[in-house]
From Swiss-Prot:
Function summary: Guanine nucleotide exchange factor (GEF) regulating clathrin-mediated endocytosis through RAB35 activation. Promotes the exchange of GDP to GTP, converting inactive GDP-bound RAB35 into its active GTP-bound form. Regulates clathrin-mediated endocytosis of synaptic vesicles and mediates exit from early endosomes. Binds phosphatidylinositol-phosphates (PtdInsPs), with some preference for PtdIns(3)P.
Region Disordered: start-end pairs: 455-554
Membrane topology, record value: Peripheral membrane protein
Listed GO MF terms: guanyl-nucleotide exchange factor activity; phosphatidylinositol phosphate binding; phosphatidylinositol-3-phosphate binding
Name listed for the protein in its UniProt record: DENN domain-containing protein 1A
Length: 1010
C-alpha cells in the first residue's frame, strides 16, 4: 500500500548505542556502549553516530537543543528505520535505539529508563532490560508489554489515527504550527514539493516532520525523508527531487548560502511559511474550507479529531478511486486513470490530473491493487470513511470484488457469472439502506417544520383551511354562508368573570348540547366528522354543488346574520389583532353527519337605514361588533353565561306579528338569548314556567337640547301619523341625533382627569321644585352608557332605561352634583341588606326591605332597578350588571301593578302604542317601537320650562327602599295616563332652597358611599 514501514521485523530493535559528543566538528562521535555486542553492521554504526548530534557543535545554544528526537534511515529496500535518541544534560552524550517499529512513545520511555541506569552505573539492570526487550517477540498492536517492574507499555497500532495528546508527534506539531501553515504544508506535500522545516528544538522539529507526514494517511511520503538533517548531509537541501527535511536552526546559516530554488520553507520558531507556489489555492475550495473548519473546531478538544479531519479531506479527494477499478475475467484488477479523472466534477479534475502523476498516489494505488489481486483484501479507517461519506459514488465493482472475488495461484476460482448475483445484492442492500435513511430524515424534517408552524402534527390531524371570501362570493347576494360552530380541542374553563352577551345567533347541535364552561364537551374535529366520506363544501364552490351535498332539512336553511341588514356590511373575517384564539382565525367547515338547527333574530330597519351611514361607526353593522369583540368562547354554542339569567329575545319586525308561543318556548329552552333591540325589555320567565311573562317597558328618556327637540318632535309627528307602520321602525332623524348625543356623552365621560376636579354645586334661589327630588329618586337613573359602548346607532346590546326624567332641568342639576367621569368610576360589590340613611329630606327614614345587590366590573356603571317585584330575576340591560333573585313581594298581589290590564280585557296593541306615543312624543325621542304583548309606562309632560345645556350623564343612584316606589304603583286608567310621580310631586310642591352646607354634606355622602 505504499507504506515504507517494514512488515514483520525480526526483533523489536536493531541496536542500542551510547555516544559521546565530539570535542570539535572535525572529530567523529565516540561510541561508548553497544547492544547487542555482536552487531556487525559497521556502516550503520557510523551513520547512527553522526545522526546523534544533528546540530552545530560550535553553536552557543547547542546545550539547549532538547532531549528526545528521532531520525530516519532508509535501507536498501526503501524501508525506514527509526533512530530514537535522547540527549543527556548539556548534550554531552546521546542514547539511541534503532528500530523498524515506529513506537515513539514506548522507545522514548525506555530511553529515559536506560539513561537513568547509565547515570547510576546500574549496568546489570540496563543489560537485563535490553536483553528482555531484544529477545521479546513482537506483540500484536494494542496489547500490553511488560519488560520489568518499571518498564511496561501498550503496543501502538500504526493503522489507527493518531490522537492528542497520546501521540507525541501530532501533539507537538499541532501546538507549534498554526492552522493556515498546516494547510499550506499539507497542500505542498500533496503536490510533492521540496519542503524544508527548521526549528531550534530537535524534539519539536522531528515532531513536525513526523506529524505532517502522518496527515497524508493512507498515503506515505515516497521521496527523501529526513526528519533531522546532520551537518555532513546539508547538500541534500540542493537535491532536485522532492524532499521533506528538518534542519536545526543552528545550521540554517549554511543552508541559506545554498541555491535553493522552488523550496517551501517553514520556520517553526516564528511560525512563518514561505512558498513560491499556490498549492493551497489549487486544491478544491470545498475541501479546503471544510478541512479548515474541522481543524478549528477540534483545536480545543482531545482525541483523533485533527487526524480525522485530514482523513476526510483525503477521502474527498481520492475516495472515488474505486470507480476506476477494472475487473476483467481471468485478468488482474487494474486501475484506469482516465476514468478516475473524467467521472469527477470539473473543479476537481485539474487536481486529479496532477494527482495521478504523484508518486505517493501511484504507490497508494499499487498497494491497493496488490491486495486485491492477491485475494487478501483490506479494511482500514480510510475505507470506512469512504463508506460513511459521500465520496464512494457507484463503486459497484469494488463491492463486487469484496463479496465474491477469490484468487488462488494467480487465477480466479469463480467466473464473473457466479460473482455477479451476490454483488448486486450487496449493492442493492447498500442503496436501499441509504434511501430509507434519507426518506426518514426528510419526513422528520417536514414533520418538525409543520409542528413549528402550525403547533400540531399533520400526521394525526389535518389543519383547518383558512379560506378568505373571494370576489365571486361577495357578488352573490342571495347565497348565504352557513353558520357553523367551532370544532377543535377542548379548552379549559375560564374564570367566572363578567362577559359580553353572545351574538344573536342561536346555534344548537346534538354533538355539543351538553357543553358548559365547567364541563366542556370534546368537539369533534372536521376530519372525524367527515368520516362518512362527505367533503366539506368550500365557499368557493358553486351553489348548485353545495346544495346537493347539503343535508335535506326543512328547518335548516342557509342563514346569514350579517347580510341583508345594511348595504355597507363587512363580511370579511376579523383582523388578526381582534382574535383572541387561533380558533377565531379558522374558517369552519360544515358537518354533514349532524344537522344543526339555526334560530336567529335580526333587526329589519327601514330602507333609509339600509342606505345611510351611521356617524362615528367603527364597524359596518352592530352585529360585526359582536363577531369581532375577541372572546372566542362566544362563538361556541350552548355555552351559558354565568352572569346572565335566561331570557327570551323579542325583536320588532316590519309587520305586526303576534309572538308565537311555541317558538318563544323553543328559543328559551334551547339557548341563552340576549336582547339587541333598543327601547324594549323582556322579563325572563321564572324557572319551571312554560309561558313567557309580559314585561313592562318604560319609554326611553328624552334629550334635553332645544335644537334636538325640534328635529325629534318633527320626526315623532311623522311617526304618529302612521302608527300602524311604526312598529319595528326607527326614524332617521332621531337615530342620527341620538348617536350624536351619545357621542358627546362619550367624549365628556372619557376623561379621567375630571374625577379630581371640584364638584360644581348650584346654590341659586328659585331653583325648580323637582331638582333635588330628581337627584334622589332611584327611578331617575336616566340613560346608561359607558365609555366603552359605541354610539347609539351601533349598540350591539339592548339600550333600555328603567325610567326617564320628566324634565331636562332636573338632569342639569343632577349632573352638577357628580361629574360624568366620576360616575364611571363607581362600582358596587354585592353586599347584604342594610339600612339606608334618609337621603330624601321630605320622606321619613325607612328600613330597606330588599336591597338590590349589584355585581359588575370595577369600572362599570351603577343601574337602579325598575322595581323589586318584576319577576324572579331582576336584570339590567347593560352586560355585567346582575341583580340577585328575590322572591315576589306582596306588591304583586296588590292593586293591579303598574296599571296591568286584566287578562279578560282585550286591548289592541296598536291603539295602546299610539296612545302612549301621543302622550309622550313632545318631550322624548322614540327609538324603537313597543312590540305587542308589552305594557308601557306612560309619562306626563313636564310643566317646567326646558333648560338649554348639553346632555349630561346621570349620577349613580344606589337602590332605594321599595316603599318609595309605592306612589307610582297605582292603577292606571285606560282612557287617561296618570303620572306615577304626581302624589310625590304634589307633596313637594313648595319651593326648596338648598343650603350650601346641606348640598356639600350630601355631595360628600355620595362620594364616600361604598
Amino acid at each position: 500500500m505504499g507504506s515504507r514501514l517494514k512488515q514483520n521485523p525480526d526483533t523489536t530493535f536493531e541496536v542500542y548505542i551510547e555516544v559521546n559528543r565530539p570535542g570539535s566538528t572535525d572529530e567523529d562521535p565516540e561510541l561508548q556502549r553497544i547492544f547487542p555486542e555482536d552487531f556487525s553492521d559497521q556502516e550503520v554504526l557510523q551513520t547512527v553516530t553522526k545522526f546523534c548530534f544533528p546540530f552545530s557543535l560550535d553553536s552557543l545554544t547547542s546545550s539547549h537543543v532538547g532531549q528526545n528526537f528521532t531520525f530516519v534511515l532508509t535501507d536498501i529496500d526503501s524501508k525506514q528505520r527509526f533512530g530514537f535518541c535522547r540527549l543527556s544534560s548539556g548534550a554531552k552524550s546521546c542514547f539511541c535505539i534503532l528500530s523498524y517499529l515506529p513506537w515513539f512513545e514506548a522507545f522514548y520511555k525506555l530511553l529515559n529508563i536506560l539513561a537513568e541506569y547509565s547515570s547510576k552505573n546500574q549496568d546489570s539492570q540496563r543489560n537485563e532490560l535490553l536483553k528482555t526487550l531484544h529477545g521479546h517477540p513482537i506483540p500484536e498492536p494494542g496489547t500490553p508489554m511488560h519488560l520489568s517492574v518499571h518498564s511496561h507499555f501498550t503496543v501502538p497500532d500504526s493503522q489507527e489515527l493518531p490522537s492528542i495528546p497520546e501521540n507525541r508527534n501530532l501533539t507537538e506539531y499541532f501546538v507549534a504550527v498554526d492552522v493556515n501553515n498546516m494547510l499550506h504544508l499539507y497542500a505542498s506535500m500533496l503536490y510533492e514539493r521540496r519542503i524544508l522545516i527548521c526549528c531550534s528544538k530537535l524534539s519539536t522539529l522531528t515532531a513536525c516532520i513526523h506529524g505532517s507526514s502522518a496527515m497524508l494517511f493512507p498515503m506515505y511520503w515516497q521521496h527523501v525523508y529526513i526528519p533531522v538533517l546532520p551537518p555532513h548531509l546539508l547538500d541534500y537541501c540542493c537535491a532536485p527531487m522532492p524532499y521533506l527535511i528538518g534542519i536545526h536552526s543552528s545550521l540554517m546559516e549554511k543552508v541559506k548560502g545554498m541555491s535553493l530554488d522552488d523550496v517551501v520553507f517553514l520556520n517553526v520558531d516564528t511560525n512563518t511559511l514561505e512558498t513560491p507556489f499556490d498549492d493551497l489555492q489549487n486544491l478544491p475550495n470545498e475541501v479546503v474550507s471544510a478541512l479548515k473548519n474541522r481543524i478549528r473546531k477540534m483545536s480545543t478538544t482531545t482525541g483523533d479529531g485533527v487526524a480525522r479531519a485530514f482523513l476526510k479531506a483525503q477521502a474527498s479527494l481520492f475516495g472515488s478511486y474505486r470507480n476506476a477499478l477494472k475487473i476483467e475475467p481471468e485478468e488482474p484488477i487494474t486501475f484506469c486513470e482516465e476514468t478516475f479523472v473524467s467521472h469527477r466534477s470539473s473543479g476537481l479534475r485539474p487536481f486529479l490530473q496532477n494527482a495521478i502523476q504523484l508518486q505517493l498516489f501511484k504507490q497508494f494505488i499499487d498497494g491497493r491493487l496488490d491486495l486485491l489481486n492477491s485475494g487478501n483484501g483490506f479494511s482500514d479507517v480510510f475505507e470506512e470513511e469512504i463508506n460513511m461519506g459521500e465520496y464512494a459514488g457507484s463503486d459497484k465493482l469494488y463491492h463486487q470484488w469484496l463479496s465474491t472475488v477469490k484468487k488462488g495461484s494467480g487465477a480466479f476460482i469463480n467466473t464473473m457469472k457466479t460473482r455477479a448475483n451476490p454483488a448486486m445484492k450487496t449493492v442493492y442492500k447498500f442503496a436501499k439502506d441509504h434511501a430509507k435513511m434519507g426518506i426518514k430524515e426528510v419526513k422528520n424534517r417536514l414533520k418538525q417544520k409543520d409542528m413549528a408552524e402550525n403547533g400540531f402534527s399533520t400526521a394525526t390531524e389535518e389543519p383547518l383551511p383558512q379560506i378568505s371570501p373571494s370576489s365571486i362570493e361577495k357578488k352573490r347576494g342571495e347565497e348565504r354562508r352557513p353558520i357553523t360552530v367551532h370544532f377543535g380541542q377542548v379548552r379549559p374553563p375560564r374564570p367566572h368573570v363578567p362577559r359580553r352577551p353572545k351574538s344573536n345567533a342561536v346555534v344548537e347541535s346534538r354533538t355539543t348540547a351538553g357543553s358548559s364552561p365547567d364541563q366542556p364537551q370534546q368537539y369533534r374535529t372536521l376530519k372525524e366528522s367527515d368520516a362518512d366520506g362527505d367533503e366539506a363544501i368550500s365557499p368557493e364552490k358553486d351553489s348548485s354543488e353545495a346544495t346537493v351535498k347539503e343535508p335535506q332539512s326543512t328547518e335548516v336553511k342557509h342563514v346569514s346574520l350579517l347580510e341583508d341588514i345594511f348595504s355597507n356590511l363587512q363580511t370579511e373575517p376579523p383582523l388578526l389583532s381582534q382574535a383572541k384564539s387561533l380558533e377565531d382565525l379558522r374558517t369552519p367547515k360544515e358537518d354533514h353527519e349532524n344537522q344543526f338547527t339555526f334560530d336567529y333574530q335580526r333587526m329589519d330597519l327601514t330602507a333609509q337605514e339600509r342606505t345611510r351611514t351611521i356617524p362615528a361607526m367603527k364597524h359596518g353593522h352592530p352585529y360585526n361588533k359582536l363577531w369581532s369583540m375577541g372572546h372566542d368562547d362566544m362563538a361556541i354554542p350552548n355555552k351559558y353565561l354565568q352572569i346572565s339569567p335566561e331570557r327570551h329575545l323579542t325583536l320588532p319586525s316590519n309587520s305586526t306579528v303576534t309572538p308565537h308561543k311555541d317558538s318563544a318556548l323553543t328559543n328559551i329552552e334551547k339557548e341563552v338569548t340576549i336582547a339587541s333591540s333598543q327601547g324594549n325589555i323582556t322579563i325572563p320567565r321564572p324557572h319551571g314556567r312554560k309561558t313567557p311573562e309580559l314585561g313592562i317597558v318604560p319609554p326611553p328618556p328624552a334629550p334635553r337640547g332645544i335644537k334636538l327637540q325640534t328635529a325629534m318632535t318633527d320626526a315623532n309627528k311623522q311617526q304618529t301619523g302612521d302608527s300602524s307602520n311604526y312598529h319595528g321602525q326607527i326614524t332617521e332623524g332621531s337615530l342620527r341625533e341620538l348617536s350624536a348625543d351619545n357621542g358627546e356623552k362619550e367624549t365628556a365621560g372619557s376623561s379621567t382627569s375630571e374625577i379630581l376636579k371640584p364638584v360644581k354645586v348650584s346654590t341659586e334661589v328659585g331653583m325648580n321644585d323637582d331638582d333635588l327630588l330628581s337627584l334622589l329618586d332611584p327611578l331617575k337613573a336616566g340613560r346608561y352608557q359607558t365609555a366603552s359602548q359605541p354610539p347609539m346607532g351601533t349598540l350591539p346590546h339592548s339600550f333600555e332605561t328603567p325610567c326617564c326624567s320628566s324634565t331636562p332641568l332636573l338632569t342639569s342639576l343632577q349632573s352638577d352634583f357628580v361629574s360624568p367621569a366620576f360616575s364611571h368610576q363607581l362600582g358596587f360589590a354585592p353586599q347584604p341588606a342594610f339600612l339606608h340613611s334618609p337621603l330624601n329630606p321630605f320622606a321619613q327614614a325607612l328600613a330597606a326591605e330588599k336591597t338590590a345587590s349589584v355585581m359588575g366590573p370595577p369600572m362599570g356603571v351603577f343601574k337602579a332597578p325598575v322595581a323589586t317585584a318584576l319577576g324572579s330575576h331582576s336584570f339590567l340591560p347593560t352586560p355585567g350588571i346582575y341583580h340577585s333573585p328575590r322572591p315576589l313581594t306582596s306588591a304583586l298581589q296588590g292593586s293591579n301593578l303598574f296599571g296591568q290590564i286584566s287578562s279578560g280585557t282585550p286591548l289592541n296593541p296598536v291603539i295602546r302604542q299610539s296612545h302612549s306615543l301621543s302622550e309622550t312624543q313632545s318631550n322624548m325621542p322614540l327609538m324603537t317601537s313597543i312590540p305587542a304583548g308589552h305594557r308601557t309606562l306612560p309619562m306626563v309632560q313636564s310643566r317646567s320650562k326646558h333648560q338649554d345645556g348639553k346632555p349630561r350623564e346621570y349620577p349613580p343612584i344606589p337602590p332605594r327602599p321599595a316603599k318609595l316606589l309605592e306612589p307610582a304603583l297605582l292603577p292606571t286608567k285606560s282612557d287617561q295616563p296618570i303620572d306615577p310621580f304626581e302624589d310625590l310631586l304634589n307633596k313637594t310642591k313648595q319651593t326648596v332652597t338648598p343650603a350650601s352646607g346641606k348640598v356639600e354634606h350630601l355631595r360628600k355622602q355620595w362620594e364616600t358611599f361604598e
